[in-house]
């Protein structure tokens, strides 16, 4: 199996090659390429399938004890500076490679049917392949410089894909919002990388951690600077993983095609932030203040995301806020030292959320013939209802994903979320309490989405065509994703913790030697499942059995309802303070430029013209006038000279 480690470089190169071939064809032979559109889709799918096979081989080797692989070449070398590029494969890398390639492959298979009538079909697959290549390159990066390069490529691709339907004003605005919001975090990340290099003289992850540890022992006063540098680095994941307060771009990103929403929310863009925090964990772990900040950022994000999801009527935005909340769990876990548990939840959530988004795309696809192609209609859950009768496979797979996200045993996310809550309870009880309440809200809003969409009666019966089950090309990926949604959690059970033995923080040993406490497990699992079931029960009473009037409840809690529906007014605050403030400053500077700067220049020009206009009368062509002027000039000069001499 050594051949797979020798072929690691093919994992990002294969999808990159497919995107380049299709992209060049689209630029040079547009009509021919469009005529062969399905062939280009097959090329992208085939390249991703090969990358997935190689990734599986790499993971197999890592599982069987092959040492981590580090291959680098010196790209820039001077007497005082050395920059290397290459790849680094360890258990974290090999796991992420499989997650990214498997989800991307299924998204591409799904997209082949979902996008087949779209005129931008080939362009979509070009962007999709570059997007996946960027994430694979980021995962393989051995140092912060290479990470930053691929980090920016991921951001660029998200801009292209969120704004894929750029003729829609909402899509164009959403892509700009995502791009600009992420630039804020990326600027902090760049400053943090440079600060860490200034302190340690290295961009390598392991070297930074070791050298920083030595520096903090030798020069304790550097701790403040180190904290600032690490917080700046953390700004990148805050934006990329949609953490408070830079989370505002994520719901708007739903303006892109649904397959892209699945990929962004499952295995690429938002996962990049969690991955970077995990890579930098040995550095952050030396600074308790930074770890506390990370833990509380994740906790607040999990809570805020859940509250915002409670009132959503758009199925994709409801799932988007769910992603924001679950990412908060992962960041909280990393901040509290639960490294293995956070990455386990990243993996289980990736498959469950990809399943949910692709199932939502199937619903939207089925609603389009009934209510039209406007997202305001075909994504509105209040226009749905009773779809389980028309789309049984979609409903079944969506229900599996919903139960998994809610933490219902024995589905995948139960094991990872329960492990996070158990670890957080031991070190940060307040964070645990907030996360525990969030688990209850998760059960409520996730089943609210399911009940509004699939249960009850169909609420858009306009005498037109009924929704139909999607084509096999879209349903098959849902069925395949249902398998890891059910089964992958078995890797991280406390009875046989395969995951923890394989993925743990660098320099730390797994906790296999700790004796399993069944009573403690049942207590923690019972509390998390219990609060989740309470949320599900309330949701059922309100949106399935209608025993509780949801409208009256929202009216009774009107202030809270408005607060959650308005997304805690955070977007409004940014719009008024930052956007409108920037515009006001720009308009003020424009007025200053036009009236002061331009006015001064124009006044000088006017004065010159006036002087010239006055002097032109002295050039009248009459000799006697010139003689008279000379006489007056001589007399005036003589008077000045006489006056000056008499004063001496």
Swiss-Prot record:
Its main location: plastid. GO terms for biological process: ATP synthesis coupled electron transport; electron transport coupled proton transport. The chain crosses the membrane at residues 7-27, 39-59, 89-109, 124-144, 147-167, 189-209, 215-235, 258-278, 289-309, 327-347, 354-374, 395-415, 432-452, 472-492, 518-538, 625-645. It is found in: Plastid, Chloroplast thylakoid membrane. GO terms for cellular component: chloroplast thylakoid membrane. It is a multi-pass membrane protein. The keyword NADP applies. Its EC number is 7.1.1.-. Pfam families: Proton_antipo_C, Proton_antipo_M, Proton_antipo_N. It is an enzyme of class 7 (translocase). It catalyses: a plastoquinone + NADH + (n+1) H(+)(in) = a plastoquinol + NAD(+) + n H(+)(out); a plastoquinone + NADPH + (n+1) H(+)(in) = a plastoquinol + NADP(+) + n H(+)(out). NDH is composed of at least 16 different subunits, 5 of which are encoded in the nucleus. NDH shuttles electrons from NAD(P)H:plastoquinone, via FMN and iron-sulfur (Fe-S) centers, to quinones in the photosynthetic chain and possibly in a chloroplast respiratory chain. The immediate electron acceptor for the enzyme in this species is believed to be plastoquinone. Couples the redox reaction to proton translocation, and thus conserves the redox energy in a proton gradient. Belongs to the complex I subunit 5 family. This is NAD(P)H-quinone oxidoreductase subunit 5, chloroplastic. The lineage of its organism: Eukaryota, Viridiplantae, Chlorophyta, Nephroselmidophyceae, Nephroselmidales.
């Amino acid at each position: 199996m050594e051949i797979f480690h020798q072929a690691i470089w093919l994992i990002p190169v294969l999808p990159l090659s497919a995107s380049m071939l299709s992209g060049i064809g689209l630029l040079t032979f547009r009509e021919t390429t469009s005529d062969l559109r399905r062939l280009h889709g097959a090329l992208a799918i085939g390249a991703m399938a090969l990358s997935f096979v190689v990734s599986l081989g790499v993971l197999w080797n890592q599982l069987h004890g092959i040492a981590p692989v580090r291959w680098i070449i010196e790209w820039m070398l001077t007497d005082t500076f050395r920059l290397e590029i290459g790849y680094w494969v360890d258990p974290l890398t090999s796991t992420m490679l499989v997650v990214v390639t498997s989800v991307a492959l299924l998204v591409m298979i799904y997209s082949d049917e979902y996008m087949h009538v779209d005129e931008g079909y080939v362009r979509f697959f070009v962007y999709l392949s570059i997007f996946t290549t960027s994430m694979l390159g980021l995962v393989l990066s051995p140092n912060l410089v290479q990470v930053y390069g691929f980090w920016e490529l991921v951001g660029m691709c998200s801009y292209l894909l969120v704004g894929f339907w750029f003729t829609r004003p909402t899509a164009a605005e959403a892509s700009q919002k995502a791009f600009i919001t992420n630039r804020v975090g990326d600027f902090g990340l760049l400053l943090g990388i440079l600060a860490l290099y200034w302190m340690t003289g290295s961009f390598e992850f392991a070297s930074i951690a070791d050298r920083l540890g030595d520096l903090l022992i030798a020069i304790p006063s550097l701790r403040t600077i180190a904290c600032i540098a690490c917080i700046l680095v953390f700004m990148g994941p805050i934006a990329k993983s949609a953490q408070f307060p830079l989370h505002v771009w994520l719901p708007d990103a739903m303006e892109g095609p649904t397959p892209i929403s699945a990929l962004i929310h499952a295995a690429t863009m938002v996962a990049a932030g969690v991955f970077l925090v995990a890579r930098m964990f040995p550095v952050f772990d030396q600074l308790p203040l930074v770890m506390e900040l990370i833990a509380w950022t994740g906790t607040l994000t999990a809570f805020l995301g859940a509250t915002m999801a409670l009132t959503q009527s758009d199925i994709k935005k409801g799932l988007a806020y769910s992603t924001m909340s679950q990412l908060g769990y992962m960041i909280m876990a990393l901040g509290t030292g639960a490294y293995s548990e956070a990455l386990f939840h990243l993996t289980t959530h990736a498959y469950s959320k990809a399943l949910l988004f692709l199932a939502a795309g199937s619903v939207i696809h089925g609603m389009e013939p009934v209510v039209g192609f406007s997202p305001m209609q075909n994504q509105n859950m209040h226009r749905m209802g009773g779809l389980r009768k028309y789309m049984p496979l979609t409903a079944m797979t969506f229900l599996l994903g919903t139960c998994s996200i809610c933490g219902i045993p024995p589905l995948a996310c139960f094991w990872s979320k329960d492990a996070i809550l158990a670890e957080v309870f031991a070190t940060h009880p307040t964070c645990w309490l907030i996360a525990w309440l969030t688990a209850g809200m998760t059960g409520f809003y996730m089943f609210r989405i399911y009940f509004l969409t699939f249960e009850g009666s169909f609420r858009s019966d306009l005498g037109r065509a009924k929704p139909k089950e999607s084509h096999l090309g879209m349903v098959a990926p849902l069925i395949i994703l249902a398998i890891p949604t059910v089964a992958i959690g078995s890797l991280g059970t406390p009875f046989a913790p395969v995951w923890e033995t394989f993925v743990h923080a660098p320099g730390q040993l797994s906790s296999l030697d700790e004796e399993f406490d069944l009573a403690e497990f049942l207590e923690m699992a019972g509390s998390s499942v219990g609060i989740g079931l309470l949320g599900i029960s309330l949701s059922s009473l309100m949106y399935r059995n209608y025993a509780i009037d949801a409208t009256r409840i929202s009216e009774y809690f009107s202030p809270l309802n408005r607060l959650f529906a308005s997304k805690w007014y955070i977007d409004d605050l940014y719009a008024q303070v930052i956007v409108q403030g920037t515009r006001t400053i720009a308009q003020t500077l424009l007025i200053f430029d036009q009236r002061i700067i331009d006015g001064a220049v124009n006044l000088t020009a006017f004065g010159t013209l006036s002087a010239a206009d006055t002097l032109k009368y002295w050039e009248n062509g009459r000799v006697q006038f010139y003689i008279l002027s000379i006489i007056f000039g001589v007399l005036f000069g003589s008077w000045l000279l006489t006056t000056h001499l008499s004063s001496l």
